[in-house]
């Protein structure tokens, strides 16, 4: 994609260097590509957000085969699917003494082909490991991987609910800005929910 024109000047700031001038992930957090062995833990992290909150607009909890299909789809598009490990009880297939504390992946922003250089980022963390720098490590690695894949714009769609409040400052620390708001586009658990569109150039 090196011959692509630069994005037009506008409200989205130019990206700061991905390897410098960014939040530094906390020690003790390891980010790596997800494997099929991680999917039971990914499903475990995701389920309460689907079942109990409006953070995600999914209404059906995905089982492991559904997550396997998602992993395959992300890989087929050349996009990253990452997990973050921290010290904790050992899991099958994980190094001794580590536990997957969060995951992040990228999806196509829209199906039409001209959107191919824009991706949507998704990050979920186990609340039991909040405050350990897991989100910082995942978002840093996700942006690095997307830049390497030739993505030019990253969008994150954040539900405007208290449970997602931590997502806004995390993304803003990495240079995301609010690009818009969609009013009452989701209905879940008996209420209408707005979404906030965050965007960052790579």
Indicate where each model-derived feature is located.
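Helix-loop element at the rim of GNAT/NAT acetyltransferase active sites that forms part
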Residues: 44-61, 73-74
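A short beta-loop-alpha structural element at the N-terminal edge
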Residues: 30-42
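Conserved GNAT acetyl-CoA-binding A-motif
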Residues: 146-159
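Active-site acidic-Proline motif in GNAT/NAT acetyltransferases
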Residues: 123-128, 132, 160-162
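Acetyl-CoA-dependent GNAT
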Residues: 15-17, 33-36, 59-128, 139-140, ...
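Conserved catalytic-core motifs of GNAT/GCN5-like acyltransferases
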Residues: 105, 157-159, 172-193
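Conserved acetyl-CoA-binding loop-helix of GNAT-fold acetyltransferases
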Residues: 131-147, 165, 169-173
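Short acidic N-proximal helix/loop "leader" segments that mark the beginning
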Residues: 1-26
């Amino acid at each position: 994609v090196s011959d692509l024109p630069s994005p037009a000047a506008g409200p989205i700031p130019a990206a700061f260097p991905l390897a410098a001038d960014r939040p530094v992930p906390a020690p003790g957090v390891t980010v790596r590509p997800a494997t099929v062995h991680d999917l039971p833990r990914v499903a475990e992290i995701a389920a309460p957000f689907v079942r109990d909150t409006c953070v995600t607009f999914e209404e059906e909890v995905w089982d492991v085969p559904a997550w396997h299909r998602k992993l395959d789809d992300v890989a087929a598009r050349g996009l990253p699917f990452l997990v973050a490990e921290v010290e904790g009880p050992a899991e099958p297939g994980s190094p001794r003494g580590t536990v997957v504390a969060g995951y992040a992946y990228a999806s196509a922003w829209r199906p039409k082909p001209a959107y191919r250089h824009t991706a949507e980022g998704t990050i979920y963390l186990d609340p039991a490991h909040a405050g350990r720098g897991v989100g910082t490590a995942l978002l840093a690695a996700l942006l690095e991987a997307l830049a390497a894949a030739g993505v030019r714009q990253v969008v994150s769609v954040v539900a405007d609910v208290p449970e997602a409040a931590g997502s806004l400052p995390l993304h803003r620390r990495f240079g995301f800005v609010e690009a818009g708001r969609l009013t009452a586009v989701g209905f879940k658990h008996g209420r209408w929910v707005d979404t906030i569109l965050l965007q960052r150039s790579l």
